[in-house]
Amino acid sequence: MAASNQSEVNIGMVGHVDHGKTSLTRKLTGVWTDTHSEELKRGISIRLGYADCEIKKCETCDEPECYTVDKKCDACGGKVSTLRKISFVDAPGHETLMATMLSGASLMDGAILVIAASEECPQPQTKEHLMALDALGVEHILIVQNKIDLVSEEAAIENYNQIKEFTKGTVAENAPIIPVSAHHGANLDVLLKAIQEFIPTPERDETLTPKLYVARSFDVNKPGSEIKDLKGGVIGGSIIQGALKVGDDLEIRPGIKVTEGNKTHWVPIVTKIISLGVGGKKLKSAAPGGLIGVGTELDPNLTKSDALSGSLAGLPGTLPETLEKMVIKPQLLERVVGSQDELIIEPLKTNEVLMLNVGTSTTVGVTVSARADKAEIKLKLPVCADKGDRVAISRKIGSRWRLIGYGIIL
């Protein structure tokens, strides 16, 4: 079980740009996840945003009115008890940021697909995000039909029917569809009830060797800080198995690129965990669930501006090898989703350049050999990954990377 300050489950907020993912996250958590200056300017999410909330229940009111994220019951003002703490991963919906969404999907135990009732369904990234969840094995999905305050009842029903048609034959075929107005906070109690019912907390085994997917990394020092006041680099991400505690040594792979003569290789970084935190609260140990900040002894230059995002961290000597070549068993989709004309997907070809997402890392590779059941890919940036891990595969079509399927590392 995660420490009491920790979230138990990570839920992705996915969907087409501007359909209300960030607004819905804010309504549930009180946190506006677009805090990056460029995001505020452009009004879209660029990096992964994180925010936590507690689902609470009033003991006296009937369902669904009894569910809330507030300190008191919304219906009667009475006492509430906490059922579960959850973390939202707010993924960008813009097509040029698909790689960021794919790296976020590896952290998700379940997902909420946000679809605006005010637009035709499906929009390109609605399709692409659903395919990504399918490809990366995210099975517990809820659909939020947002912006119902902007349409008539007839239009909302027509949009609902479009959603049903669109999800047929996908991982979300039987997903509940919940009409919501994030702007007015309407029907959030119904959504909270559905999260409790349809997105379970995964069973975690804390005795396994710990592994942490690094999604962000920071230099938390302010410019002009005194040397004695400088803090070590901070990494942020999700523990996917096992548990880490303050004082543990930590190995981070692939690590640092070292060039000697005309040869380049990667050296893992080893450091010590100085602090663990979640949502501003300190922890002595951390288990799977939620998004954890890990304070280290690293030079902040190594962690600034997400320099270590995409890494895998764990106890020294326990991580898988760093791969500069990858052999995968590909499973390709039938058609390209997310583009206007849905082209048939051709098999992988030798010397083709592909974008690959494994864990939270994004890399580009060239296929050295390609058969229907096996492809070998030489990576531009190495990754640290295990046999059996899923890899999302994207191909450049026109000027954009498009998801074409996934592979299993052999």
UniProtKB/Swiss-Prot annotation:
Catalytic activity: GTP + H2O = GDP + phosphate + H(+)
Enzyme class: hydrolase
Keyword check for Zinc: yes
Residues that coordinate or bind Zn(2+): 58, 61, 73, 76
Pfam families tied to this protein: eIF2_C, GTP_EFTU
Cofactor requirement: Mg(2+)
G2, as annotated region: 43-47
A GO CC annotation given for this chain: cytosol
Record CDD domains: eIF2_gamma (cd01888), eIF2_gamma_II (cd03688), eIF2_gamma_III (cd15490)
Region of interest: G3: 90-93
Binding site for GTP: 18-23, 146-149, 181-183
Region named G4: 146-149
One Gene Ontology biological process: formation of translation preinitiation complex
Domain tr-type G: start-end pairs: 6-203
Binding annotation for Mg(2+) 1: 22, 45
The keyword Ribosomal protein is assigned to this record: no
Positions contributing to Mg(2+) 2 binding: 18, 43
UniProt GO molecular function: GTP binding; GTPase activity; metal ion binding; translation elongation factor activity; translation initiation factor activity; tRNA binding
EC number: 3.6.5.3
Region G5, annotated ranges: 181-183
NCBIfam families named among the record's database cross-references: eif2g_arch, PRK04000.1, small_GTP
Description of how the protein assembles with itself and partners: Heterotrimer composed of an alpha, a beta and a gamma chain.
Function recorded in the entry: eIF-2 functions in the early steps of protein synthesis by forming a ternary complex with GTP and initiator tRNA.
Family under the similarity heading: Belongs to the TRAFAC class translation factor GTPase superfamily. Classic translation factor GTPase family. EIF2G subfamily.
Protein name as annotated: Translation initiation factor 2 subunit gamma
Organism: Methanococcus maripaludis (strain C7 / ATCC BAA-1331)
Gene that this sequence comes from: eif2g
